């Protein structure tokens, strides 16, 4: 097929407003998601210039990064956090933006509540002043993070100047074995191509293992596209996508729904379309994963050992490994199942959806959090929290000794009151294990919700495929 296009190319082409020769094209933005951290300066810029919002009906705001997961009271916030959430509330009032504040039943992490409200739709361009905006690509949307100056530009014009990215296909063939989740799939991918293997690309995830995932699982995979350096991650929409979106608040209704689905079905990579790069993995080879170092690419299977830098031929990589081991406080050759933890965090925009909490609850039910371990569970949104409580998951966690919290970004990043102390070692379902990410001197191991819950009750990492 001469004019065969990839999924990304189709969405890109449909959104070009103008493409002057020698300049970056201008693309249209369908949805703009806003939170309290990266928006204040953008709104201030509009006020100084006397500009209005170009499309307030396509702008959605929430409070998530700085909010307390212990109390919905403003008094629970630090002075800086309180200033940020109050500033967002005032800006939304001044500019007519829909806001899901800390008292709204649908408030939550921006990348959790957006999809569950039907704001995220196939074939759209979605931006947010947040690096994990790629999450929304699970629906066949082109979604990526932007900086504060770009936030202001989108608020004012509903457009962005963007250079077209290269295309990469990551195909995960076959089916995973028991105990292997979407988190393990994406960690295995990053382990294979590295934390910069996707730089300059928009990645399309495909293959039987991806198609078999729920929308929650696909969101987990696309969420971490940025952790392999990619601009965005995408999965072609299919019946799983349509079933998830049907009836959601901002999804099309009636005849509009029928027309939308017909259009969405065409948003897929054509036979014969050529990618700039192709990566293949066999799902059957993927075991439960966990990181050992200080970036998501420093990852091994649970039945493996901490790698030895001496076996690395590349001097730069070897030095990076040595530095990571020094910070993380591990010795080469240590079995991963011998690593003890004292903190567990189940939450974040990567793994705080209902499927994630159900998976974790399986390993918490009838057990107790190990002595000396503090474990918290933070639902990704008010909707997730309500559903989990309706299913009795909160009781399972509480009876096992986990703390059950309010929605928010929480311990993913040391920007609120949920943070690690120096020397703490945490099994975390978040997306980044950089030095100090969860608190100064903190040591983070990225895992799936099931692996995190199992570590909480065992006091160390375990292979959830085996009795423990």
Curated annotation (Swiss-Prot):
Pfam families, per database record: Aconitase (PF00330)
User: What EC numbers are recorded for this enzyme?
Assistant: 4.2.1.33
Is Protease among this UniProt entry's keywords? Answer: no
**Keyword set for this entry?**
4Fe-4S, Amino-acid biosynthesis, Branched-chain amino acid biosynthesis, Iron, Iron-sulfur, Leucine biosynthesis, Lyase, Metal-binding
Q: Which Gene3D superfamilies match?
A: Aconitase, domain 3
| Residues reported to bind [4Fe-4S] cluster | 349, 409, 412
Q: How is the cofactor bound?
A: Binds 1 [4Fe-4S] cluster per subunit.
| Names of required cofactors | [4Fe-4S] cluster
One GO term in the molecular function aspect is: 3-isopropylmalate dehydratase activity
What biological processes does GO assign it? Answer: L-leucine biosynthetic process
**HAMAP family annotated for this entry?**
LeuC_type1
What protein name is recorded for this chain? 3-isopropylmalate dehydratase large subunit
Tell me which species this is from. Shewanella baltica (strain OS223)
Q: List the gene name.
A: leuC
């Amino acid at each position: 097929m001469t004019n065969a296009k990839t999924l990304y190319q189709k969405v890109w082409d449909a959104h070009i407003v103008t493409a002057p020769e020698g300049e970056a094209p201008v693309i249209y933005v369908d949805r703009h998601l806003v939170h309290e951290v990266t928006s204040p300066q953008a709104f201030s810029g509009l006020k100084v210039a006397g500009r209005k919002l170009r499309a307030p009906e396509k702008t959605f705001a929430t409070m998530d990064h700085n909010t307390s997961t212990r109390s919905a009271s403003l008094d629970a916030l630090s002075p800086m956090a309180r200033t940020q959430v109050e500033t967002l509330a005032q800006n939304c009032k001044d500019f007519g933006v829909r806001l899901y504040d800390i008292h709204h039943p649908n408030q939550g992490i921006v990348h959790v509540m957006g999809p569950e409200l039907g704001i995220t739709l196939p074939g759209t361009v979605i931006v947010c002043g947040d690096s994990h905006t790629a999450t929304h690509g699970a629906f066949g949307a082109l979604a990526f993070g932007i900086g504060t100056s770009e936030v202001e530009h989108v608020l004012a014009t509903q457009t962005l100047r963007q250079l077209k990215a290269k295309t990469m296909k990551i195909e995960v063939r076959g089916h995973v074995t028991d105990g292997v989740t979407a988190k393990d799939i994406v960690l295995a991918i990053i382990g294979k191509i590295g934390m910069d293997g996707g730089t300059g690309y928009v990645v399309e995830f495909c293959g039987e293992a991806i198609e078999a995932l729920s929308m929650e699982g696909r969101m987990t995979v696309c969420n971490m596209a940025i952790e392999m350096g990619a601009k965005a991650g995408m999965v072609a929409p299919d019946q799983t996508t349509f079933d998830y979106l049907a009836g959601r608040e901002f999804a099309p209704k009636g005849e509009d729904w029928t027309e939308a689905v017909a259009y969405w079905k065409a948003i897929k990579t054509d036979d014969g379309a050529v990618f700039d790069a192709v990566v293949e993995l066999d799902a059957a080879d993927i075991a439960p994963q966990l990181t050992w170092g200080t970036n998501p690419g420093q990852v091994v299977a649970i039945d493996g050992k901490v790698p030895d830098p001496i076996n690395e031929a590349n001097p730069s990589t070897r030095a990076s490994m040595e530095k990571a081991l020094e910070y993380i406080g591990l010795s080469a050759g240590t079995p991963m199942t011998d690593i003890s933890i004292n903190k567990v965090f189940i939450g974040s925009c990567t793994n705080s959806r209902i499927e994630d909490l159900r998976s974790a609850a399986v390993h918490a039910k009838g057990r107790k959090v190990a002595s000396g371990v503090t474990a918290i569970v933070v639902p990704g949104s008010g909707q997730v929290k309500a559903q989990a409580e309706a299913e009795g998951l909160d009781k399972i966690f509480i009876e096992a000794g986990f703390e059950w919290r309010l929605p928010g970004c929480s311990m993913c990043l040391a920007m609120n009151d949920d943070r690690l102390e120096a020397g703490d070692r945490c099994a975390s379902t978040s997306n980044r294990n950089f030095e100090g990410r969860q608190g100064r001197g903190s040591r983070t191991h990225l895992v799936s919700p099931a692996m995190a819950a199992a570590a909480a009750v065992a006091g160390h990492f375990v292979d959830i495929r085996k009795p423990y």
